[in-house]
């Protein structure tokens, strides 16, 4: 059953290649969605796929790429998408 999760990562996660690495990992896993930086210094992802795929992305996001220092990771499993998402992309910062 396809689900949509919002994942917000805190810590040193901007300026370290986090979004690009997240796109690569999400595509490797087979998810759709997007990732972006937020003004508050966090990285937000909306990911759509099977629960086991989403769990795999969450596990990766808790570690991130080599230079990231993740302090916490919030997951909203009740996030509702307006429609199915195609592909996985890096979006502009908000």
Residue ranges and their predicted role:
Residues 1-94:
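Intrinsically disordered, low-complexity, mixed-charge
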């Amino acid at each position: 059953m396809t689900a949509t999760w919002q994942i917000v990562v805190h810590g040193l996660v901007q300026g370290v290649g986090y979004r690009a690495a997240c796109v690569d990992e999400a595509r490797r896993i087979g998810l759709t969605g997007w990732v972006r930086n937020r003004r508050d210094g966090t990285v937000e992802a909306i990911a759509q796929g099977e629960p086991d795929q989403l769990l795999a992305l969450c596990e990766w996001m808790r570690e991130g790429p080599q230079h990231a220092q993740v302090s916490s990771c919030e997951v909203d499993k009740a996030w509702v998408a307006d429609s199915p998402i195609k592909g996985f992309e890096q979006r502009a910062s908000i």
